[in-house]
Amino acid sequence: MEDSDFDDAELDELYEKAINRRVNETLIRRSLPVQRDLQNGVVPGQDTYYEEIRTEVTFGPTHHQLNEELLHSYIYPTNFEVRDYQFDIVRKGLLQNILCAIPTGMGKTFIASTVMLNFFRWTKTAKIIFTAPTRPLVAQQIKACLGITGIPHDQTAILLDKTRKNREEIWANKRVFFTTPQVVENDLKRGVLNPKDIVCLVIDEAHRATGSYAYANLVKFINRFNSSYRLLALTATPATDIEGVQEVVNNLNISKIEIRTEESMDIVKYMKKKIKDRVNIQTTVEIENIVEQLGIAILPVLNQAVELGIYESCPPSAINAFKAMQKSQAIIMNPSIPEGIKWRNYFILQLLNHVGQMLKRIKIYGIRTFFSYFQNKVKEFTTKYDLGKSTNKIAAGFYYHPMIQAITKECEEKIKDPNFLGHGKLEHLRDELTQFFYENPFESRVIIFTELRESALEIVKCIDSMENSEIRPHIFIGQAKGKEGFDEVKFVRKHGPKGRKKSDREKRLEEERRMDEEKKQAALQEKLERTSRRTGSSEEAQLSGMNQKQQKEVIKKFKSGLYNVLVCTSIGEEGLDIGEVDLIICYDTTSSPIKNIQRMGRTGRKRDGRIVLMFSSNEASKFDQSMNDYYNLQKLISQHLVQYRKSDRILPPENQEPECEKKFIEVSEEDQELNNMEDTDDVIRFATQCMLGKIPKTKKGRDKGKAKKGKTFFMPDNVITGIITANNLVRKRKSAQNGSGAALLDSIVNDDIDLEDEDGQVEILDVDQEVNRRLASNAVQKTNDMALQIRNEETPEIGDTRNKAKASSSMKVKKEPTMAVDHSDDEEDLPLSRHVERASRETAKEVPNATNVAEKPFPPLEFGVQRPSKRQRLQPEVQPEVQPEVQPEVQPEVQPEVQPEVTVKPEVKIKTEEGSKLYKNIFFSDEGFLQPHEKELFLSKYNPEDATVTIEPVPRFVRAHGRVKHSKRTEQLITLFEDMNHNRVARTIEMNKLRGIARRLHTVSQSQGQSNSQSQAHSTSQKSQQASQKDRSSQDKDLTNSELEDLLDSDF
């Protein structure tokens, strides 16, 4: 269960504002007769009085907004026949919390729809909720509510999916809801639904509201905040005893129980005729022989249990599995019994429980169902006992008894005959079906109820073996997968001797693989054989269970006539709209009156029906006892032995009794279309589309503009909420007047400075002092600052920024007429552009008091220092080719197809004094890099001793810089740093490989140096030999360098 999102303070606030229920307790003391002595004195130690507490519950005005003009009357739809019991229950259900217990098929959904309709009229904004435990029941109520009462479909919502998508918006905008109790409970605890908004709650299958089921938890949560709401509980049987009825009344705050039976005076005239036939089936000779043999085998164990006082004395054939299980649980829970005695008694009772199950199966269901259970238990115990995994000698005396072996042999011989019927019920079942389909038309339907899946499949096979094409059976069970029997081979392989040698282990593994493959092949072959049989789908369902889709498909085929006999377990007893059924056959019976009544309520709804009850062994007495308990329960309820809870009237007290307004409800075309639907999923799908305004639930139809309503968090006043980025926490500087000039210059170089202030005015950037300081530290001569030629260009799309930046090295840049710096005025208007071009020597003017530069500037496409590559440093004798200076070609005409129209921003101005500029045109060979003395310090202090390949320190590179194109070396460095920042594995592997090669070269170089120094100490006669040896070593080194070239040609 989820925790509630409300804190204690919010809970108290909701409680105080929402609860209009007041409880007044009065303490009354009453005197008791006392014993007196001879002097008429009261004998001490006696209670002279007792205290009686009287509780009076009152309710204040409701907090719901009511439509005052509609409170004087309530509407009762006349679209169907007006029945007295329905009319009476609706009238009482509008003013009290009612538990409506009437037989199945008598219109409980109509009663609920009428109550929901009137509370929809009486209130303005309150919520009406219908809850049911299953989807089919919800679909039935949707049809009844929208297709009968005419409640607007745009005010209704269906909440069945587990997703919480748009749940808050649906609860806020709709008024009538059809859902399951789990959904409502979870949304209440999450704070999505306000419990004060609920004015009417309908609970279907209310007999489930016991213990910790969702119904009980849901009502308990609502009662904490809201007592002014109407609750209507629907069921066919409230409980099996008076204690269960009282628990349901307490959990649901019931004020009145309206119970009807098929014999009630106001309901009997609306009931269709039901003929009940009781058939007592005698056990066969084969069954009696097996029961007698089981009794002989279990008699020693039963006598020992009787002597120990843990089981009652009885004939072996009367052992009851349920009693044995209860006594075994009581022994386990008793801490006073010593452990040895406790477990001995437990295993004895467990064995009696297993024998009781065997006797029940063979007496009620037949030899086939009995033998599947019996064989599984015998195989499980004997396998474990033979391997030493069980030491229960008491159970061994039973399972290794000669009678058990005789039973196994006899049952195997009987089951081999395909025409063998394991019980007399199967023969009588055949006769009933043959006679029924002979006397009735083929449109008739039959349902057969049984508790066990094995029995259901046996019945299907028995009917199919009749080879009557007019009788088409199919199984109908739940979703759970069938229980697999004991796997003897798997258990032996797991717990048997495995061997200690490697050959034994490999042999065992090979055998396991072979056996698994054989098992898969056998399962596949068996599945193929099942599909070829008429009962193949039923056999597959019995093994793997039936999901909701398969269940819906079977019901659809049953209604259409493809199947006319449905063999159901308990899943077909409650809530499902299976259709009109003319014959019900109860293959077995239960001690629960709820199940028996639910079974018999499947027929006789719209036409007469017939019920066949098959009894064997003690089933007849068990059925009579359960029905007697049900009738006695009705008497106890009618005698007011149940303590009810007072409920709020909700309506103002001046409206003593609203008048009934019988009215024919006009149903819209959409609601009429809903009435014609039979499939549950179609009903739910149609109702969901109506809830959304007939808009299909597609991605395009969703409203993405509305922001999702988030949770409310309580925080101090004026606190900053939301996510704050690190960039917003940094105070940005817009001028160099109040801060360091170095930071401002870095911003200029990195092109991340804003030229305009908050008012849109252009700031004058004065960076003379910082530029002079940096230029003075250089070892090279200073140069004149040149004005920049700048063009304005539209900002590209965000998605194309990276692609354009990558292609900047190959783009053709349009040349504009250059502009010289005019020093007659301090300001000059310059056009802006992403692409920056250097001024040529012919068009640039010198800045006064500036020295000329002795070093040529770099070409426009080379932003960086011309240093020898790694290959050149390894081969110093090879001189790199000098690249001629590329002079920009001045285009006399502007090509509009190459470059867009240029616009000039005259408002952008810059201060151009000595040593200051925004974008530089001349770059020095070492500008932005370490100086010689700094490099020497770096190599001596921070460079590894064994490093032969080093990377020069470089400034911060901006890959998306569009004004100056990077050189090839710079592009490689940028790519390297990006790979290192993203921790790319390929780059790390490549760098490690290069590092290993470099270290190898360094080691070879040192060894060669040592050999050369030793050779210099030799005589001069060996100098020629030393020179030749040196040449050979250099050739070897050149060979290694040639191998390294392929690696160095790559991008690091």
Curated annotation (Swiss-Prot):
CDD domains with a match to the protein in the record: DEXDc_FANCM, FANCM_ID
Pfam families xrefs: Helicase_C (PF00271), ResIII (PF04851)
Extent of Low complexity compositional bias: 875-898, 1005-1028
Disulfide bonding pattern of the chain: none
Top-level taxon in the UniProt lineage: Eukaryota
Keywords, alphabetical: ATP-binding, DNA damage, DNA repair, DNA-binding, Helicase, Hydrolase, Nucleotide-binding, Nucleus
CC annotations in GO: nucleus
Chain ranges of the Helicase C-terminal domain: 432-649
GO molecular function, one term: ATP hydrolysis activity
EC class name: hydrolase
Transmembrane intervals: none
Binding site for ATP: I102, P103, T104, G105, M106, G107, K108, T109
Annotated Basic and acidic residues bias: 503-532, 1029-1040
Region (Disordered): 495-550, 798-832, 869-898, 1002-1052
Reactions it catalyzes: ATP + H2O = ADP + phosphate + H(+)
Similarity-based family: Belongs to the DEAD box helicase family. DEAH subfamily. FANCM sub-subfamily.
SUBUNIT field: Interacts with the MHF histone-fold complex to form the FANCM-MHF complex.
Biological function: ATP-dependent DNA helicase involved in DNA damage repair by homologous recombination and in genome maintenance. Capable of unwinding D-loops. Plays a role in limiting crossover recombinants during mitotic DNA double-strand break (DSB) repair. Component of a FANCM-MHF complex which promotes gene conversion at blocked replication forks, probably by reversal of the stalled fork.
Protein name: ATP-dependent DNA helicase MPH1
